[in-house]
Amino acid sequence: MHEFTTEVEELAKAVMEYSLARLKSDPPLDGPRSEADLYAELGNTITAAGLGGKETLKVFTETLALACISTDHPRNLAFIPSAPSEYSNLFDLVVGASSLYGGSWQEGAGAVFAENQAIKWLIDIAGLPSSAGGVFVQGGTMGNLSALVVARDQVRKTHPDTQRWVIACSAESHSSITSAAHVMDVDILKIETNSELRLDGEHVAKAIDELHATTNKRVFAIVGTAGSTNLGIVDDLASLAKTAKERNIWFHVDGAYGLAGLCAPSVRHLYQGVEDADSFIVDPHKWLFAPFDACALVYRNPHLAKQTHT
């Protein structure tokens, strides 16, 4: 199974030939097909005898790949998920061929070192202190959940008698925030946005103060969105940070989609306030054009995350 045979070498050449041709050409405008249609053409692809490398590559290149949207095509930029650059795709091949495991320093010191360098760069452009730190996780859903678990863990220490915990966000927040709330068994406080459809500190302060005054529920996190997936809206992060700080509430920024806009001087001002976040996420596989999928999760005080998740 792990021998480099003549057959494997021939397959490697075919893989490289296909990969180079795909990278050199303009991205195709492919699209989905129905399950029934695909099954009629391919039948069962998992068999007792196996298809073999050559046939498997043929199935992929001639059928499966053509039934997928090419998210790196300029006309598909609105699909958001991923548009890796040529360099990213090539180094994805290099990393895969190297059989790396970056889960701990013992097994993958070099990989972890490289990841830490990337995290440090993101910390620098976001304006957080050098003491901040983070980790890469598999997608924004996991990043948001991880940060919100830390947020709740912190506030539990000072408000042990709270009846129900609550996350405050806007109606435009990503569905992963609601998913995180379900997993954590906490409530969601959806707050009205301003005339520009941005969540701001004034509206959030009013909603939270009213909730705290009339119920035994307590908001443990305010989530600001840095680039909503529907309209690309960046919330008023500066005023949200101020509201959170005044009430000793964790401020998390979901920048999975749009926070990479910090790299563009023309729109950098929209993200003012992210430097005051207790945590944020950004997906390099989106506007940083890395391979899918990668979510950078950053904490202002990484030792708090270590306490919660270990």
Where are these regions (language model features)?
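Glycine- and acidic
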Residues: M1, L42, S98-Q106, P129-V135, ...
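N-terminal entrance/gating region of PLP-dependent enzymes' catalytic architecture
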Residues: M1-S131
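Short, conserved micro-motifs enriched in small and acidic residues
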Residues: W105-A109, F113, V137-L145, L231-V234
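Short loop-beta-helix segment that forms the pyridoxal 5′-phosphate
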Residues: L122-S146, I191-E192
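Conserved PLP-enzyme active-site core in the AAT-like
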Residues: M142-T308
